[in-house]
Amino acid sequence: AIELMKKFLDAATVDFKANGNAEFYLKYMSVPKEEEIFQTLLLMKEAKFHIEITDLIIPKIGDNLEDARKLVRWIVENLGENTPIHFLRFFPHYLLRNLPPTPIETLEEHAKIAKEEGLKFVYIGNVPGHELENTYCPSCGKVVVRRYGIETLEINIDEQGRCKYCKAKLPFVMEISK
C-alpha cells in the first residue's frame, strides 16, 4: 500500500489517540495490534514521506504521561528529532460525552515531555491562541511561523528555508508565496 501511496503523496499525518496505549486501542477502538501503526510509520519513513504525528489526549482514559514518554521516545529513535508532534485537545462528543475537555495543563505536560525527550517541533492543537500553535526555530527560539487556529499570521523563513533571525537551516519542505 505504501508503494501505491508514494505515487500520490509526499506527506502524511498519522493520528494517535491516548499516546498509542495498547489497552485504550483495544477497548475503545477495537484495534488488536497497535504495533502495526508503528510498522507503517517505519515504512513511510523508508519511502521518504514527510511525517507528522497527532495525538488526541483524552482526559481520565487516555492522558498517561508515561505512555506519552514511551511514544515520544519511539518517535525520536525511529523517525527522528525533527518529526513534528501535535498534542490535540479532546472535546466531549458521541460516546465519550461523559468526559471533560482535555485540560490545557495536561497538554502542556505532554509537550514538556516531548521537548525533554528531544523533539524539536512540538505543538498543542485545538487551543486557539496558545503559544505552542507556533513554530519556533530550534537554534534561536524565535517564532518562525505564527498561527492562530488554522490561520497562518506570519512566516519568518527566507526563500532558502532558513530562519530570518539567525539564518539556521530549517528542516521544512515548503514554498513561500508572496
Language-model-detected regions and their locations in the chain:
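Conserved AdoMet/S-adenosylmethionine-binding subsite of the radical SAM
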Residues: 1-102
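Auxiliary Fe-S-binding modules of radical SAM enzymes
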Residues: 60-178
